[in-house]
Amino acid sequence: MIFPDNIPLNPLKNGQLWISHYPGKRGIENKAIQAEMDLLELKKRKIDIVASLLERKELAELQIANLFELIKKHKFSHYYFPIKDKSAPKNKVQLRRFLNNLCDEIQKDKKILIHCNAGLGRSGLIAALICKKLGIVEEPIPFIRQYRPGAIETREQEKLISSLDLA
């Protein structure tokens, strides 16, 4: 079962930001069946958008190569921005575009789930950058870790959060 953590975005109306492991992760024998169950749970929580950070090769390695098809089957909007595990994106232009898209959706009161593998490093990174861009907090790293312990796993991720100009 999927149990995403909510990152409070007050005072932003009804837009919501959630972080989790990938749908299907807890599936022991059949990850696709678990992914279906997890996606149904996300629908119950009124999640509108799934933002995936896994690389395509990871999907195969994790035995959930059809995850994106399942996301579409369950009628979620889907944003895809692959980031190598334990690292930070190199292309800042594409990163800013991705963040702008997600922030626009939040400001339209959409509910977004961000996931990578465990929902810690890459997901925490993107959540922190969204909070920084939206001006939710001045120190996004401890803020995200308060709601998702273990989030933002590497110095490279921490440095990017501190240094990236999002104006």
Where are the model-predicted features located?
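Cys-dependent protein tyrosine phosphatase-like superfamily
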Residues: 1-113, 125-167
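Conserved G/P- and acidic residue-centered "switch" motifs that form tight phosphate/ATP-binding loops
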Residues: 119
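Conserved SAM/SAH-binding loop-helix junction
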Residues: 122
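Short cysteine clusters
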Residues: 116
